[in-house]
């Protein structure tokens, strides 16, 4: 699973939601996205913390408030999905040298 903590403002909330789903899908893993709620002198924060599965489906969503989210992660279903769609095999072997 990936844990992604952030401080995305209200005016970018759809970007936040989209990126959570994208990270879960591209890594074929469960993802916990934790975003700030409330306001400060510069911005208002949307919250929208969520638990997302390896297909990009939202398992739990906190909406605009602080909340503890709980969901069951099915590692067998995840492994079966990775076998059916082995995207990791598309990785190129390369090195970055500076």
Regions found by a protein language model. Name each.
Residues 14, 71-72, 92-94:
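A short, polar/proline- and glycine-enriched secondary-structure boundary/capping micro-motif
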Residues 67-84:
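A short, polar/charged loop-to-alpha-helix boundary motif
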Residues 1-69:
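CN hydrolase (nitrilase-like) catalytic-core segments centered on the catalytic cysteine
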Residues 79-98:
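Cysteine/selenocysteine-centered motifs that mediate thiol-based redox chemistry or coordinate metal-sulfur cofactors
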Residues 20, 73-74, 96:
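Residue-level signal for alpha-helical context at structural boundaries
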């Amino acid at each position: 699973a990936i844990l992604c903590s952030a401080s995305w403002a209200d005016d970018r909330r759809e970007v936040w939601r989209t990126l959570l789903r994208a990270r879960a899908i591209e890594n074929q893993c469960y993802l916990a996205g934790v975003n700030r709620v409330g306001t400060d002198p510069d911005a208002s924060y949307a919250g929208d913390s969520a638990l997302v599965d390896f297909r990009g489906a939202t398992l739990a969503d906190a909406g605009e408030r602080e909340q503890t989210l709980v969901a069951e992660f099915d590692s067998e279903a995840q492994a079966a999905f990775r076998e059916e769609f082995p995207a990791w095999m598309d990785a190129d072997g390369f090195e970055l040298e500076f």
